[in-house]
Swiss-Prot record:
UniProt GO molecular function: (3R)-hydroxyacyl-[acyl-carrier-protein] dehydratase activity
Protein name: 3-hydroxyacyl-[acyl-carrier-protein] dehydratase FabZ
Alphabetized UniProt keyword annotations: Cytoplasm, Lipid A biosynthesis, Lipid biosynthesis, Lipid metabolism, Lyase
A Pfam entry, by short name: FabA
InterPro entries linked: FabA_FabZ, FabZ, HotDog_dom_sf
Active site residues per record: H48
One GO term (biological process): fatty acid biosynthetic process
Entry GO terms, CC: cytoplasm; membrane
Functional summary from the UniProt entry: Involved in unsaturated fatty acids biosynthesis. Catalyzes the dehydration of short chain beta-hydroxyacyl-ACPs and long chain saturated and unsaturated beta-hydroxyacyl-ACPs.
Organism expressing this protein natively: Paracidovorax citrulli (strain AAC00-1)
Length: 146
């Protein structure tokens, strides 16, 4: 549905902070499913943890937020410019259920719950196979920057 080249046009993130590799499903204004292929080459594994590498939970949340950003830009039907940025403004109910290790494929399911007062609220679940790795409610807003 969306390859890395299309993702790079919509997200400002770059290595080592781009955490979405592909979009596999997208229902405009409703939901998105994306993937992050987790490899031993991720820079965070050097220190988290050297003898038992585990993806930091906060980066799983960031991957969900990036998927939410892709859903939002697609919903608006426009690509971001230098003057528009989506900011991650809040999170509720974050829960971590299982570790994510090198070789795992993180499946990111995000649905838009509502838009109110310029705040977009999403429900997100990150899975490895059928096993939930983390879940949270994510809030973002778009801002025009100079």
């Amino acid at each position: 549905m969306m390859d890395i080249h299309q993702i790079l046009k919509l997200l400002p993130h770059r290595y080592p902070f781009l955490l979405v590799d592909r979009v596999v499903e997208l229902e405009r204004g409703e939901r998105i499913q994306a993937i992050k292929n987790v490899t031993i080459n991720e820079p965070f594994f050097t220190g988290h943890f050297p003898n038992r590498p585990v993806m930091p939970g906060v980066l799983m949340l960031e991957a969900l937020a990036q998927a939410a950003g892709l859903l939002s830009f697609d919903m608006m039907g426009e690509a971001p410019g230098d003057d528009k940025v989506f900011y991650f403004v809040g999170i509720d109910g974050a829960r971590f259920k299982r570790p994510v290790e090198p070789g795992d494929q993180l499946i990111l399911d995000v649905k838009l719950d509502r838009i109110k007062g310029g705040i977009y609220k999403f429900g997100g679940v990150a899975r490895v196979g059928d096993s939930v790795a983390c879940e949270a409610e994510i809030m973002c807003t778009m801002r025009t920057v100079a």
